[in-house]
């Protein structure tokens, strides 16, 4: 089985592996992870200041559709996307209850996944856009790769956080190739 997560879902993947082991899991794929830790703290001085995170939450709370419109371009990076794709992703966010959005953001920005990442023992592919404004690659993707022994980091130039939607034409083949490579090695 291959576990695939995007954004906060990457935290779910690594937390699952750290708690339940990898007996049934052959590999993992982490897309634009928010791991290992976003918020600034005493032992994470390069993180995002909590005041900035609070301001982002306040902006979201004040006007969800406006927040989506303001953040659409950074979400997709330099990848050209159709207005329909922007509308589809925006609709998913707008249709999510506000309390769920806020609590999810608070959880994924303050949860420390460093120990979880260090315990991952399955082959892991990390794909991250170099223009990811939601989870900057130097704060998240590169550090995640450094904490998982033997992981592979694939950087998409010009891609943002929404690479699953904007860059699916290159993402899907890369994920399938990784799964195929790992299956061939296991055979």
Predicted stretch roles:
Residues 149-187:
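Catalytic active-site module of serine/aspartate enzymes centered on a nucleophile-bearing elbow/loop
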Residues 39, 43-47, 58-118:
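Conserved alpha/beta-hydrolase catalytic His-Asp/Glu region
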Residues 130-135, 162:
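Acidic catalytic loop of the alpha/beta-hydrolase fold
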Residues 14-62:
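Flexible "cap/lid" loop of the alpha/beta hydrolase fold
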């Amino acid at each position: 089985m291959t576990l695939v997560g995007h954004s906060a879902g990457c935290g779910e993947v690594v937390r699952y592996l750290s708690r339940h082991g990898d007996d049934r899991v052959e590999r993992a794929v982490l897309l634009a992870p928010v791991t290992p830790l976003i918020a600034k703290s005493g032992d994470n001085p390069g993180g995002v200041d909590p005041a900035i995170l609070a301001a982002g939450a306040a902006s979201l709370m004040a006007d969800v559709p406006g927040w989506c419109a303001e953040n659409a371009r950074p979400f997709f990076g330099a990848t050209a996307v159709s207005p329909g794709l922007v509308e589809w992703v925006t609709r998913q966010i707008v249709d999510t209850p506000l309390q769920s959005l806020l609590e999810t953001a608070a959880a994924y920005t303050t949860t420390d996944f460093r120990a979880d990442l260090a315990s991952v023992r399955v082959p892991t592919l990390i794909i991250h856009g170099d223009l990811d404004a939601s989870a900057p690659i130097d704060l998240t993707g590169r550090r995640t790769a450094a904490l998982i022994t033997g992981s592979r980091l694939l950087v998409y130039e010009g891609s943002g956080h929404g690479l699953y939607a904007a860059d699916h034409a290159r993402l899907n083949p890369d994920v399938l190739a990784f799964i195929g490579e790992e299956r061939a090695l296991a055979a």
